[in-house]
């Protein structure tokens, strides 16, 4: 059974505080938008899909008990609060896309004379709750599509470990499982699907400095699921790919540009370079909501920079020399030329065909 990072019922929202993992499992009550903004910004909840869901649900629990005088005041409340939530962590596109969809819905309901203010509020609440259910379904589809793509490619290349009956070894980076989504996961969902098919020989996860999402969160999930897993340092990836017959790398994404350039957790780019050198296929697993067709390439993606303290301290203990300067981008951009395929809930696409394929899917 996968971990539950988000507990929601109408009017009530709690999130598993990921800053305390793996030492302590504690849920934090989110009472409204201010709480939602803080837990996203402080990374008590993280992962692009989870950020969007928690952000939208924080608004849902805030407006649920309120009585609005008219539809105009409700529409203004929705638009203003959603735009504010987008600012909590701007690199992840999912929150912006979700906000735009809900603002569009609010505007449509506002203009619909047959809908009164109470109906408008309940329609909005229904839409936010539907996002939670859809994310889990999308994750499962991503997992199935990704596992199939990896197994087909590996079988064709003959890269399964000797004596493994078709099972594979994979590497993942950061945390992209149940803790980063509404449930199941994106890249880790692919790993989970491989395990369900009996085709997972081994999974390697990076520590993912400086926030250690791999060591704290992914390792926690892998142990919970009892998957055959090994933690490696970020600096070990080249040695790992050379020595351990890894069949594929699969990572998540915070934003994918229309040309396939992908912003993901810092360190992803160098893993892609190493994978290319060792002829290991490199996959990005992401829902359609992580793909931003409005951005032509990775150079246009805003990269969030985090506080120095995340690099210089572990807990309250300083590990870096006082006075040293730090550069701490939270993400890097992997060029499309290094990406084998982008795994979505609607299929696996080569970066060069991504824009046309997604445009057709959205039109249909």
Curated annotation (Swiss-Prot):
Keyword entries, A-Z: Amino-acid biosynthesis, Cytoplasm, Isomerase, Methionine biosynthesis, Nucleus
Cell compartment(s), UniProt: Cytoplasm; Nucleus
Matches recorded under SUPFAM superfamilies: NagB/RpiA/CoA transferase-like
UniProt site (Transition state stabilizer): 174
Segments passing through the bilayer: none
Any one of the GO BP annotations: L-methionine salvage from methylthioadenosine
EC number per UniProt: 5.3.1.23
Keyword Membrane part of the UniProt annotation: no
GO cellular component, one term: cytoplasm
GO function terms (MF aspect): S-methyl-5-thioribose-1-phosphate isomerase activity
UniProt KW Cytoplasm keyword: yes
Family matches, as Pfam families: IF-2B
Active-site residues (renumbered): 254
Reactions the enzyme catalyzes: 5-(methylsulfanyl)-alpha-D-ribose 1-phosphate = 5-(methylsulfanyl)-D-ribulose 1-phosphate
PANTHER family given in the database record: METHYLTHIORIBOSE-1-PHOSPHATE ISOMERASE
HAMAP family: Salvage_MtnA (MF_01678)
Protein name: Methylthioribose-1-phosphate isomerase
